[in-house]
């Protein structure tokens, strides 16, 4: 039996969770009340059903089931797992909107595709066959028939009328489709999805679990393999802080996108502005300069097919991914960001609270750099030149 990457914990035999502890110390599903057998053929050889169907040997033989994909809190009973005519795969997941079903979809779709390619019959099930299992079947239908979420959902619902993925799973299915029915680590929405999951863990544990350490990107000042050509540096000491791919772009919300203002018009506009404090003027100038520089290098720096670029994106605040040089971000829920070289304050971070940009957009979790504290540079053949 194939297992998900998450580890299952041993439960005592007296647990009320509907499972029975085996000698191996692994909880399996033995006692349950999932109602009568419920199973429907959604596509040729692909069946969607409930736990009762997956544990009823006569049903499995009647529908000539050869493969079972289980999405539940515990695995199937041992006598099903040991059946010689069955190949099984188990994903440990609860039916909750904040559960990360997205990380499993690609593997589940591959399992279904492989089984059908062998002329087998696949049963995908959870407890009632309503949310977790239907989400997986919808993901398969999206990829198999090149469908967006809604047509795939309606196709499955036409075969099994009471399917209903929870709201969190629906959002993740739409993201799965946006990424081409695969995990694209360069997709900005996927990055934000992973950050939000990590933020939930930080809220509970006050420390970043090892399973989420990958959301913290390597330090670009140390990385020497395939360095990115566009970087952000500390304005004071010119230490590399972030690469262009680390930036989480956003559109202005409360004001319309502004075009880059030509220098001569900029000077006239500046003459009409009321007097500002030094910090206000510095921040305004820094954000404006970043907008101009980003516009000039946009085509050369956004060449990655997985990068989602939005025209006229805001630079009032520079939201970035968490990066390894950010001191103690794995051990604190929020704090300030300082340059690791000159110790100048560069911005702030929070895993648990939203940060609102002056444009009106919010980001949660938020790791941001103050535009006036950094500068955009372009590297040419390992020689850094300020644009």
Curated annotation (Swiss-Prot):
One of its GO terms (molecular function) is phosphatase activity. Interacts (via tyrosine-protein phosphatase domain) with bsk/JNK; the interaction dephosphorylates bsk. It catalyses: O-phospho-L-tyrosyl-[protein] + H2O = L-tyrosyl-[protein] + phosphate; O-phospho-L-seryl-[protein] + H2O = L-seryl-[protein] + phosphate; O-phospho-L-threonyl-[protein] + H2O = L-threonyl-[protein] + phosphate. It comes from Drosophila melanogaster. PROSITE patterns: TYR_PHOSPHATASE_1 (PS00383), TYR_PHOSPHATASE_2 (PS50056), TYR_PHOSPHATASE_DUAL (PS50054). Residues 1-15 have a biased composition (Polar residues). Its main location: nucleus. Belongs to the protein-tyrosine phosphatase family. Non-receptor class dual specificity subfamily. Residues 35-182 form the Tyrosine-protein phosphatase domain. Dual specificity phosphatase; can dephosphorylate both phosphotyrosine and phosphoserine or phosphothreonine residues. May suppress bsk/JNK activation during the immune response. Residues 1-27, 248-267 are annotated as: Disordered. One of its GO terms (cellular component) is cytoplasm. It is an enzyme of class 3 (hydrolase). Inhibited by the tyrosine phosphatase inhibitor sodium vanadate. InterPro entries: Dual-sp_phosphatase_cat-dom, DUSP12, Prot-tyrosine_phosphatase-like, Tyr_Pase_AS, Tyr_Pase_dom, TYR_PHOSPHATASE_DUAL_dom. Gene3D superfamilies: Protein tyrosine phosphatase superfamily. It is found in: Nucleus; Cytoplasm. The active site is at 126 (phosphocysteine intermediate). Its EC number is 3.1.3.16, 3.1.3.48. Changing residue 126 to S: Abolishes phosphatase activity. Loss of bsk/JNK binding. Reduced nuclear localization. This is Dual specificity protein phosphatase MPK-4.
């Amino acid at each position: 039996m194939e297992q998900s990457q998450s580890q299952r914990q041993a439960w005592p035999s007296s647990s009320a969770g509907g499972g029975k502890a085996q000698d191996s110390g692994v909880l399996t599903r033995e006692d349950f009340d999932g109602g009568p057998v419920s199973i429907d053929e959604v596509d040729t050889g692909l069946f969607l059903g409930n736990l009762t169907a997956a544990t009823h040997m006569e049903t499995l033989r009647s529908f000539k089931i050869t493969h079972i994909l289980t999405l539940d809190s515990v695995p199937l009973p041992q006598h099903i797992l040991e059946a010689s005519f069955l190949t099984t795969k188990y994903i440990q997941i609860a039916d909750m909107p904040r559960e990360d079903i997205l990380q499993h979809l690609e593997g589940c779709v591959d399992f279904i595709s492989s089984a059908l390619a062998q002329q087998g019959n696949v049963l995908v099930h959870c407890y009632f066959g309503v949310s977790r299992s239907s989400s997986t079947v919808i993901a398969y239908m999206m990829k198999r028939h090149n469908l967006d979420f809604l047509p795939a959902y309606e196709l499955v619902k036409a075969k099994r009328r009471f399917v209903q993925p929870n709201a969190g799973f629906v959002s993740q299915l739409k993201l799965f489709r946006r990424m081409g029915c695969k995990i694209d680590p360069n997709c900005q929405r996927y990055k934000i999805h992973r950050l939000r999951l990590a933020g939930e863990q930080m809220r509970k544990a006050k420390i970043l679990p090892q399973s989420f350490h990958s959301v913290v990107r390597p330090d670009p000042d140390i990385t020497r393999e395939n360095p990115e050509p566009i970087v952000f540096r500390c304005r004071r000491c010119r230490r590399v802080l972030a690469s262009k791919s680390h930036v989480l772009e956003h559109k202005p919300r409360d004001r319309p996108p502004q075009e880059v203002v030509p220098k001569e018009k900029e000077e006239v506009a500046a003459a009409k502005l009321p007097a500002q404090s030094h910090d206000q003027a510095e921040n305004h100038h820094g954000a404006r300069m970043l907008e101009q520089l980003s516009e000039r290098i946009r085509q050369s720096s956004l060449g990655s097919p997985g990068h989602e670029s939005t025209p006229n994106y805001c630079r009032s605040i520079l939201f970035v991914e968490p990066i390894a040089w950010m001191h103690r971000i794995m051990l604190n829920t929020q704090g300030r960001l300082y340059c690791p070289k000159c110790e100048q304050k560069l911005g702030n971070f929070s895993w648990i609270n939203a940060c609102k940009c002056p444009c009106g957009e919010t980001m949660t979790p938020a790791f941001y750099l103050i535009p006036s504290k950094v500068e955009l540079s372009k590297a040419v053949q390992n020689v850094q030149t300020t644009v």
